[in-house]
Amino acid sequence: MKIFAMSDIHGCLDAFLDALSLVDLEDKNNKLVLCGDYIHGGFDSYAVVEKIIELKKKYKSKVVVLMGNHEHWVIEQGMPIVDEYRDEGEYDEKRENKCIYFISQMELYYKYKNEVLFCHAGVDEEAGEYWEQGTSDYHYIEKFPPDKGPFCINIVAGHVSTASPYLANNSKFRGIYYDGCSHYYIDGNVLKNGVVPVLMYDTDAKKFYEVMERGNKEL
């Protein structure tokens, strides 16, 4: 099986569609995990969530939709998905409510066996092998700063731009950041770079790749 992952779309529909074009969900051996922060920032937050709803309806369990901190803010703090004062498009109550209902059903993480953990921000790594018992909702969606180094399971997360001083420390970096041990960070700062990076985990080879139009790059 091949598990694809992307994160931090932030209302950028075109970049999301470009990323989706690299994933063949018609292949029975492929699965897609979306790691949160689909909204706020770009002009198409409704359309992004509606596209995810469409994918989930069509492909069912082949598409896993996880919650990010921006979705959590909508559910827990009443923040609107589209705020005209933030110049994010036009508020639409019907679309807002439909998207909020979908957001309320999102999971916090997805685990493939004991090999890979997908989430938005991270886990409480001080809990070690008991991370599932020791990790709060806050860690899954808001953890900061990002961890690096060896851990008992591979972590795939977004939340922090891979170009940031906490990861690649390179303002021109726009791809997937691998720390050389157990962490794969996939937030490519779409609002700046216009790109949603796509990660792929080959469960047979147990290898990670960055998926691009020109081919896959092993991480």
Regions of interest found by a model, annotated:
Residues 6-7, 32-36, 64-69, 119, ...:
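Active-site neighborhood of phospho(di)ester-bond hydrolases with catalytic His/Asp-centered motifs
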Residues 41-114, 118, 140-146:
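Active-site neighborhood of divalent metal-dependent phosphoester bond hydrolases
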Residues 179-219:
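Binuclear metal-dependent phosphoesterase catalytic core
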